[in-house]
Amino acid sequence: MTILLVGLGAALGAILRYQLTRIGNHIASEFPLMTFLINLTGSFCLGWLTGSQLSQPVTLFLGVGVLGGYTTFSTLNSELSQLWFRRRYHIFFGYWLLTYGLGLLVAAAGFYAGL
Amino acid sequence: MKIKESLAVGSFAFFGGILRYLIGLVLNQPTGFPYGTLCVNLIGAFCLPFLMRYIVARLHLSDQLALAIGTGFFGAFTTFSSFSVDAIRLVNQQQWSAFAWYVGISMVGGVLLSLLADYWAVKLTHNPEEQEVSQ
């Protein structure tokens, strides 16, 4: 049962990420803005969810499922690798440092907002 | 809306998310080091670029299947939100060295594995002998 909650949540989260990324494709920018925003908003929400300590099924569905499926680590690094191979070093380092720096910051902000 | 593509992404993400959860159950320690999240993230960081730039061309996968496996399965298998919240938990528990190792390995290891996968994919694609074998 918990497995189904996680799976369904992940499916919803991934579809949301896919639709947002499609919208983002219309923005002509070399900076992967959509993945960036998805990972930051997801980190904030999971921080909030963790801080507010809701019941286990809700946390599993929303946290492990929806937000786990919504945010992504593989696309982030794949985009970084592409920026490196295209020699866009400024964007590479900007995207890399901003994602991790702000990601940790908003996760902490979400956590304390949820307490 | 791309309903068909969305359903393909969602159904593969269903399994990606479940696999991440199961690996986390086995490897993550509630008060310790998030080995499970680190493990799925590093595997995904290598597999996604290698899939998109080598396997798709080699096996002539359709765009829709590539999208389902890449954006759906590997996108949901890996996670950034658990990474950042796990890291904040280590800070709250004042496990400074675990925090530094976790963030360091994720930050550097993730991008190195993607670079390696891309590099290897390009090398395999442009190697004439390799193409000979495949015929």
Curated annotation (Swiss-Prot), chain A:
GO terms for cellular component: plasma membrane. This is Fluoride-specific ion channel FluC 2. The chain crosses the membrane at residues 1-21, 31-51, 57-77, 91-111. It is a multi-pass membrane protein. Na(+) binds at residues 68, 71. One of its GO terms (biological process) is cellular detoxification of fluoride. HAMAP family: FluC. It is found in: Cell membrane. Keywords: Cell membrane, Ion channel, Ion transport, Membrane, Metal-binding, Sodium, Transmembrane, Transmembrane helix, Transport. Pfam families: CRCB. InterPro entries: FluC (IPR003691). One of its GO terms (molecular function) is fluoride channel activity. Fluoride-specific ion channel. Important for reducing fluoride concentration in the cell, thus reducing its toxicity. Belongs to the fluoride channel Fluc/FEX (TC 1.A.43) family. It comes from Latilactobacillus sakei subsp. sakei (strain 23K). The keyword Transmembrane applies. It catalyses: fluoride(in) = fluoride(out). Na(+) is not transported, but it plays an essential structural role and its presence is essential for fluoride channel function.
UniProtKB/Swiss-Prot annotation, chain B:
It is found in: Cell membrane. The keyword Mitochondrion does not apply. Its main location: membrane. GO terms for molecular function: fluoride channel activity; metal ion binding. Na(+) binds at residues 75, 78. Pfam families: CRCB (PF02537). It is a multi-pass membrane protein. InterPro entries: FluC. The chain crosses the membrane at residues 7-27, 32-52, 65-85, 96-116. Na(+) is not transported, but it plays an essential structural role and its presence is essential for fluoride channel function. GO terms for cellular component: plasma membrane. It comes from the Bacteria. Fluoride-specific ion channel. Important for reducing fluoride concentration in the cell, thus reducing its toxicity. HAMAP family: FluC. This is Fluoride-specific ion channel FluC 1. The gene is fluC1.
